[in-house]
A protein has these predicted regions:
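Short, acidic, metal-binding catalytic loop of nucleotide-sugar glycosyltransferases
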Residues: 17-33
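Glycine-rich, basic loop-to-helix element that forms the pyrophosphate-binding segment
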Residues: 38-53
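Short beta-strand-to-loop element that shapes/binds the nucleotide-sugar donor at the catalytic cleft/hinge
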Residues: 83-97
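A recurrent flexible, glycine/aromatic-enriched loop bordering the glycosyltransferase active site
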Residues: 101-120
Length: 178
């Protein structure tokens, strides 16, 4: 199995941690890091990564300030087209309590209950070639919602495999201002 990891980056000091979390898994992979598109949302950089997807089995999106827990690749089951890696958010944020999405009591996929914490089968992506929209209110959900229009073969992991230590804290202050 080969995985393409698409990392949109602001070239933060946490990028190495993100990359190392991939390398620790000891799997065949491509790491596609893009930071040249300045749209303020990571959409353009994710799209640049998607343009380079060719020979993998799966695509995983990983923000440069996030990381993956060991064992995530074992969750990628070929019986599914989408695997949502349950995410821990805000564990290091002093202003908000940590939360898990999808919520443990609610594994349904909808805006606010999933972020960029999903893997998509490469063959499905190449058939449709969806892109992230910078004008979407929630670009990650907008992308995933379009995927879910063509497949119901989805899995949500029981355990947390995607960690976003600061959630939105490093992007927006508690006042809601940047």
């Amino acid at each position: 199995m080969k995985i393409d990891f698409i990392i949109p980056t602001l070239f933060r000091d946490t990028l190495d941690r993100a990359v190392n979390s991939i390398k620790k898994e000891n799997i065949d992979h491509n790491i596609l890091i893009h930071g040249d598109v300045k749209d303020g949302r990571g959409c353009g950089n994710r799209n640049e990564g998607l343009k380079k997807v060719i020979d993998s089995d799966w695509i995983i999106f990983l923000d440069d300030d996030d990381y993956l827990n060991e064992g995530f690749s074992k969750q990628l089951d070929n019986n599914y087209d989408v695997v949502v890696l349950r995410m821990s958010q805000d564990a290091s944020n002093p202003f908000y309590p940590p939360k898990v999405i999808p919520r443990t009591e609610d594994s349904r996929l909808y805006s606010g209950n999933v972020g960029c914490n999903f893997a998509i089968k490469t063959s499905l992506y190449l058939k449709h070639k969806w892109l992230f929209s910078v004008t979407a209110k929630n670009p990650d959900w907008d992308f995933l919602a379009r995927v879910l229009e063509v497949t119901n073969k989805t899995k949500v992991t029981d355990e947390i495999y995607y960690v976003a230590p600061m959630g939105g804290y490093n992007k927006v202050k508690p006042t809601g201002r940047k």
